[in-house]
Amino acid sequence: MEALDWIVIGVFALALIGIIVWVVKQKQNDSADYFLGGRDATWIAIGASIFASNIGSEHLIGLAGAGASSGMAMAHWEIQGWMILILGWVFVPFYSRSMVYTMPEFLERRYNPQSRTILSVISLISYVLTKVAVTVYAGGLVFQQVFGIEELWGIDFFWIAAIGLVLITALYTIFGGMKSVLYTSVLQTPILLLGSLIILVLGFKELGGWDEMMRICGAVTVNDQGNTMTELIRSNSDPNFPWLGALIGSAIIGFWYWCTDQFIVQRVLSGKNQKEARRGTIFGAYLKLLPVFLFLIPGMIAFALHQKYLGAGGEGFLPMLANGSANADAAFPTLVAKLLPAGVKGLVVCGILAALMSSLASLFNSSAMLFTIDFYKRFKPKTSEKKLVVIGQMATVVIVILGLLWIPIMRSVGDVLYTYLQDVQSVLAPGIAAAFLLGICWKRTSAQGGMWGLIAGMVIGLTRLGAKVYYSNAGDVAGGTFKYLFYDMNWLFFCGWMFLFCIIVVIVVSLATKAPSEEKIQGLVFGTSTPAQLAETRASWNHWDIIHTVIILGITAAFYIYFW
């Protein structure tokens, strides 16, 4: 890092501080101000926040690493702007008119208090033990590699970077609430995009262009069926990404994440009205088309450079692991460290900071909101709005502490836990997705049906995760049908079958129990909206919204056709 890099980082920090100070000075009189930014966010802030919140360590390390190790396969999860459009066009009207703060609260409106509690517990545990922990852990690794510092003042630089990232982000999240998340995203998103674009351009320049990347990666097979790194659709016998499983599994996980998860939907709930919320999702969908090119393809570039350097008799581009293989997870930080000139490296570091801080801030705020609204306020409904804000700030502090305490565990088993993260999402998503999908699309879905769908998903998911831990450490143990279903079955196929099972549970239990009253589900399910509510929704979009939606869908289709 040169002096010019530090100057660029300093300017970024000053701009960030300026925004945070302005946000903190704004009055936050009630919980809606603190957790939802006063429900007056515009489409630019919503779309930028959706994108910036989504881009975290799983992209800077995981997605680029996936590009370097397996090529295009993970693009199924990243070319999902179409799923954000479903959030905007299908779910925004129901979420907006319900005036809820959280997704568990919406399930209580649609089903019962037990459903709210189940989803709140699942969400809080998964946020603290997976999303917060992995973002912090990976953030420390990224900065250790980018700065090239092993120790500082006798302390492992990993700890300085990880703890510093958490504390700085926590400070502005605690005092600024949702507004700090939204408005810092407006600054952070363009910096992240610009920094990543520079890496893409310089990477292609060093390698020799797109054709050279496709030539090198297209010559590398990734399975016994002969599929190469450049192929998105792979044999159904592929052990990791069978094409049918990838299409079904990525859709289920994407639906859960983009349309029902508090972490994302909270940005839409902060919208001024349906129009701003929907346009925010359209803007976010445009931005979501970019990660494949900004993170996954740079990972493929890093792999191609590694192969090219080795072919020329050099030592390779990527650092090597102890087992003699290239460290794919180091792809993105290695590109930053080796290719970028002074000043530009500082800008890209700002982009990395922006991604990690925005993602962490969103996690802190969403977790605090879940605790405050779904637990504290439920048991103390007469709590004043100002006290709820204080409780939210205190909850954020607790979540920060839990995240910090989890870092040593993450570091000791980081590689193993990171490998299981996709497995965690694949078993977390089906039950929740089934409860929301049928709850909004089918009037006959009963409170007991939705609740038992959630319970079935939770029990099956925990069984799968427990089996993964047991059998992976037990050696070659015979397990019969149980072992095949809960350990050996491809995680994407398991996700699909689990979703189908949860759908069946919801339907069967609903038909066996009392149907919900019209008053209970009015405005929350298709076919129950009043003429006034339908007119409000119709007035919230025009032909330009449709045109942009069609453009996004067209780009998505073209991508699949090109990499088929």
Task: Give a label for each model feature.
Residues 1-564:
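Membrane-embedded helix-loop-helix hairpins and adjacent transmembrane boundary segments
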